[in-house]
Every structure is written in structure tokens, then in C-alpha cells.
């Protein structure tokens, strides 16, 4: 959802993803990765469909289709990719799979992006969180700064929220009852974070004063070592407005 949100806000039509990297994990050094050369199209389709469901409309193969003449996948390989050469494990399914991804990508580029709610991206949470717990770490994933496990809250299901950040809020306008940024418009702003930069809070207050409905699902804290007394005052002023609520289901 993050790259799809960025594309919509920037007015871009194509959302790409380098796909199928380290499909079953990887080996840190030497040799092939787990089940390399045994890749299943069924597994790759699960990944492709998940990307499509989150707004991707252009799959880029992270594959290795070439080898020196007369040599095969056992002579030359890249540990993080899927082998898609003439001796690929799934060569008989490759064309149909590519055709499927092409067709879905074409459909995904039709029409206009729709969203009803702007959702504040918890970037400050990722900076303050530092490391993921062991249960969420992988050999190539350790830090919250990567935003790999950031999801829209369940109470926004059906509203098709797009992520926005402080820059978007600072440049957005509230006119004719909607929040506008580029070609996108939103009827409300939802904020569900533990930490919030004071600059973003100022923009939220500005827009709320202009009439934008705002949901502050949690009371955020100010990140960083140096705190400002203004933060609490701004938050109090924001929550006193009639168009600002702390109850997402209202």
C-alpha cells in the first residue's frame, strides 16, 4: 500500500515491484538458496496476487534467465533470484504465468485510483521502534525503519485509505469539504500512531481548523530527546474541535 499511495499522490500510473526475491529464504554465504531451482508457480502466484491486492500493477521478475552457451542452472546461479532460463523447473508454466500477470496488470491500470480516507503513515513509530522482535526478523529484515509490517487498521476496511505523511499534509488544501493533494481527494484524515512529530501535528491542527474531519485513534507522544511544551497545547487544541474525534467508529 505504501508505494501505491505514493504513486497515487504523485499522479503516477505504474506501480512496480521487484518480485520473487529469496522466494523461500536464503543462505547467507555460498551455495544456492533453499529450494532454489524447485520454485513453484503456485507459490509465486500467491506473492503476485498479494502485490496486486495492494496496488502493484507491474511485476518485475527478479530472475536469472541467462547462462553461458552449453551451460545450465547448475553452472551459474544467483542465490537471491528465481531461475527462469530454458531449464527452469516451471518452464512449461512460465508463459501462462507471465500472461496471467500481464492481464491482471493491464486491468489494474484502468480507471482512476479511489480513496476516501487519508491515513497518516507511522514513520515516527518506525524510527522510535528500532528493531523488530525476533519473531518478525528475517536474515535480510531486522529494523522497523523498513516499514514491512505496517497495515491499515481494521476499522478503515472499505474506505480504501492511502498513506500520507507530514509533507503531504503541509502541501494539502481543504476546499469544498475535502482534503486535496494533487489529483487525490479525501473526506477525512485518520491518525493511529504512538509517536507524532510536532510539525505534522501543526498541519493536522491547521487542516482541522479549516474543517477537515480528523480521527485521532490514540493520543500520540512527541518523539526525540528534546521535547516542546507546545506539543501538549497543540494536541489539546486539536481535540477540542468538534470535527475531531478519538473514536474511529463514530
For each feature predicted by the language model, list its residue ranges.
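Carbohydrate-binding surfaces of carbohydrate-active enzymes
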Residues: 1-250
Amino acid at each position: 500500500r505504501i508505494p501505491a499511495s505514493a504513486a497515487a499522490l504523485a499522479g503516477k500510473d505504474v506501480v512496480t515491484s521487484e518480485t520473487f526475491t529469496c522466494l523461500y529464504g536464503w543462505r547467507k554465504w555460498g551455495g544456492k538458496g533453499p529450494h532454489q531451482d524447485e520454485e513453484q508457480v503456485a507459490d509465486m502466484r500467491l506473492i503476485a496476487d498479494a502485490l496486486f491486492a495492494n496496488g502493484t500493477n507491474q511485476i518485475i521478475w527478479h530472475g536469472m534467465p541467462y547462462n553461458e552457451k552449453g551451460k545450465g542452472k547448475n553452472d551459474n546461479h544467483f542465490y537471491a533470484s528465481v531461475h527462469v532460463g530454458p531449464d527452469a523447473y516451471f518452464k512449461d508454466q512460465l508463459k501462462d504465468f507471465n500472461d496471467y500477470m500481464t492481464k491482471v496488470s493491464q486491468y489494474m491500470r484502468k480507471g482512476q485510483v479511489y480513496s476516501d480516507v487519508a491515513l497518516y503513515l507511522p514513520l515516527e513509530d518506525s524510527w522510535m521502534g528500532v528493531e523488530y522482535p525476533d519473531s518478525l526478523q528475517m536474515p535480510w529484515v531486522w529494523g522497523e525503519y523498513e516499514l514491512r509490517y505496517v497495515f491499515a487498521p481494521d476499522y478503515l476496511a472499505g474506505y480504501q485509505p492511502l498513506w500520507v505523511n507530514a509533507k503531504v499534509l503541509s502541501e494539502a488544501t481543504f476546499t469544498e469539504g475535502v482534503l486535496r493533494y494533487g489529483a487525490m481527494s479525501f473526506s477525512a484524515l485518520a491518525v493511529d500512531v504512538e509517536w507524532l512529530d510536532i510539525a505534522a501535528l501543526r498541519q493536522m491542527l491547521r487542516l482541522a481548523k479549516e474543517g477537515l474531519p480528523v480521527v485521532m485513534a490514540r493520543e500520540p507522544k512527541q518523539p526525540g530527546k528534546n521535547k516542546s511544551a507546545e506539543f501538549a497545547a497543540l494536541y489539546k487544541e486539536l481535540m477540542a474541535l468538534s470535527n475531531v474525534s478519538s473514536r474511529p467508529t463514530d
